[in-house]
Amino acid sequence: MISTRLARAGALAPKSRLFLGTRAFATVGDSPLDKKVEMANTEKGNYINYKKMSENLDIVRRRLQRPLTYAEKVLYSHLDDPHGQEIERGKSYLKLRPDRVACQDATAQMAILQFMSAGMPSVATPTTVHCDHLIEAQVGGDKDLARANEINKEVYDFLASATAKYNIGFWKPGSGIIHQIVLENYAFPGGLMIGTDSHTPNAGGLAMAAIGVGGADAVDVMAGLPWELKAPKVIGVKLTGEMSGWTTPKDVILKVAGLLTVKGGTGAIIEYHGPGVTSLSCTGMGTICNMGAEIGATTSMFPFNDRMYDYLKATKRQHIGDFAREYAKELREDEGAEYDQLIEINLSELEPHINGPFTPDLATPISKFKEAVETNKWPEELKVGLIGSCTNSSYEDMSRAASIARDALNHGLKAKSLFTVTPGSEQIRATIERDGQLQTLEEFGGVILANACGPCIGQWDRRDVKKGEPNSIISSYNRNFTGRNDANPATHAFVASPDLVVAMTIAGTLKFNPLTDKLKDKDGNEFLLQPPTGEGLPAKGYDPGRDTYQAPPADRSSVNVAVSPTSDRLQLLAGFEPWDGKDANGIPILIKCQGKTTTDHISMAGPWLKYRGHLDNISNNMLIGAVNAENGKANSVKNKFTGEYDAVPATARDYKARGVKWVVIGDWNYGEGSSREHAALEPRHLGGLAIITRSFARIHETNLKKQGMLPLTFADPADYDKINPEDTVDLLCTQLEVGKPMTLRVHPKDGSAPFDISLNHTFNESQIEWFKDGSALNTMARKSGAK
């Protein structure tokens, strides 16, 4: 059920059994919050400041005089100015002080290059870098890792030396996926973290507000500046009942994605609550929060509970769990807190779901999936099943998957489809190796990949089908846009729980329902797979495996960060030019994008990841995946000056060489997907002025602003249809003011009379400074130079 009215937590959600005691406003008294509790075992001197958070909440409560959702509590407890900050959900821009920053290696390169240009000796906020994106899956874990270390040596050496220089924790290649490492080591209840990856919200499984951002936002926080976020609305998801059988936490978010769609969470935090929460493991809650990125949510969160305490204890952080219990009344929603929208899901009635193909919000319950395959003529044969990724690679996930594989092996069966396994971290890999699940999955036919992102982000040297050949794959990943996993636009990629992935690889077909359909064993006897089983936490504790962490040295003065001037992978940054103070007249439309334009379309990953530290080289992939509304083709646009069709980046470079600015016209939810700021840096670098769309995804809109570009939306979305890609336009930049529309004057290609289109924007005063100065980094440099 979905309710779009303001919904009170107390009225619609009975008191949770997460903890005994009151859920009202009561604030925490003296002593307990004065303790010095470090936020991570890998660091010294970085403390959890529940006392400051509590004081901030007291100030905000006196001002607002109303109950708060849990999401609001975490954000407002991190306000830079709780006394003076304007607070209105969906409208105000909050200036916040995050506790931590986390960066993955593909985005960390540009973030660190930008931080270096700010001229500071060390980061002002605890920061870590995680090497997980640059390892291509080819033959298997150790060999793929060795190959990656050789190919990416220049980048890894840069990151290792830069993190040592600037007091940043460094997780080496093979350590695991950023979000699993964060959950195991850095996430803590009530904390606020930003990360340069869109699936940063994974840490919501430990009651943390963890938000994906672009590298420029990360640089601000690393430099000690407050971070700005438009105050999100809060969508409540009340969970009742209890999961059993084949239903998993993944099915909760697959269901929610189907209800809210890929843009339904934009501008909102998804807050889970209700008695059903207690039936979920901590890592299961992480799974749900992780994939909230697919519905555009700012982040997703669960309230602190005993399952989280158990996980903290299992990961050698019981002291943090004990401290959180002292602050527990503020680690959940207030009685009577209101949500902007409420969804109710009964876990006892929830079916396993499969989402896809080509979009993560096309949700189908397993009971109707066979019919959907037939109706839509999706390729029935299942070519590959893939489990793991940052979304589903916990001990519980691997244990349940192994139980299904063992059931099949006991009946003389193995995987009929190709099958891969991606452990989420070295700790997970070592633990499931010790406890036997890894051997079971290998015996079943699984190829164990490196502890890294791999096929989930397109780092997959797939060779079993030809490019352009229609085929089906199913994974426990989070994202399944066209061509994302294997660069084959004809691959039908489906997303499900690891349990369903393993079951379907046994049958080798999409038309298999393990809840009802029988298999034949080696002797031809029919049998039904048993529902999966698996412990949420290892009974023998976690095995840390190989040591893959590099702490910053005590003396950083002698560390040098070298970037070769001839490198094709790393390039020191030059500042962007400031705005010239004039309207832009007679400029071309580089491309009018038709339909879905994700960050994968704007700046592809896969083989392009190696250029993430070299802005000019990676700009050669700008918008090559976007479909041109003029001709229905990708990477084919008409040059206004030559009349010839050419690649999008080549055309943009020609315009830049002529000193001509250009704009892009986009469709709905432009820039959905990952947090990669290259999708904003590239158009800025190649001379772009504005991106004008029906609507934007949140992170991409902010990234464009940070780089001195104008993200603008049609006041009337139907005006998108009035523009011909060969028209020229005037953009009246001098009209840029807070809360006021801007004008786009269109000069039609056919010579008919010009007409005006009204454009909206979400710039505030400080963001307008970014545009005028040329970028947020330029503004930072200007202000620091003036001090």
Curated annotation (Swiss-Prot):
Keywords: Amino-acid biosynthesis, Iron, Iron-sulfur, Lyase, Lysine biosynthesis, Metal-binding, Mitochondrion, Transit peptide, Tricarboxylic acid cycle. Substrate binds at residues 104, 197-199, 479, 484, 612, 675-676. Its main location: mitochondrion. It is an enzyme of class 4 (lyase). One of its GO terms (biological process) is tricarboxylic acid cycle. The keyword tRNA-binding does not apply. Induction: Constitutively expressed on glucose medium and increased expression on ethanol. Binds 1 [4Fe-4S] cluster per subunit. Pathway: Carbohydrate metabolism; tricarboxylic acid cycle; isocitrate from oxaloacetate: step 2/2; Amino-acid biosynthesis; L-lysine biosynthesis via AAA pathway; L-alpha-aminoadipate from 2-oxoglutarate: step 2/5. It comes from the Eukaryota. Disruption phenotype: Essential for growth. One of its GO terms (cellular component) is cytosol. Its EC number is 4.2.1.3, 4.2.1.-. It catalyses: citrate = D-threo-isocitrate; (2R)-homocitrate = cis-homoaconitate + H2O. Residues 529-559 are annotated as: Disordered. This is Aconitate hydratase, mitochondrial. The lineage of its organism: Eukaryota, Fungi, Dikarya, Ascomycota, Pezizomycotina. The gene is acoA.
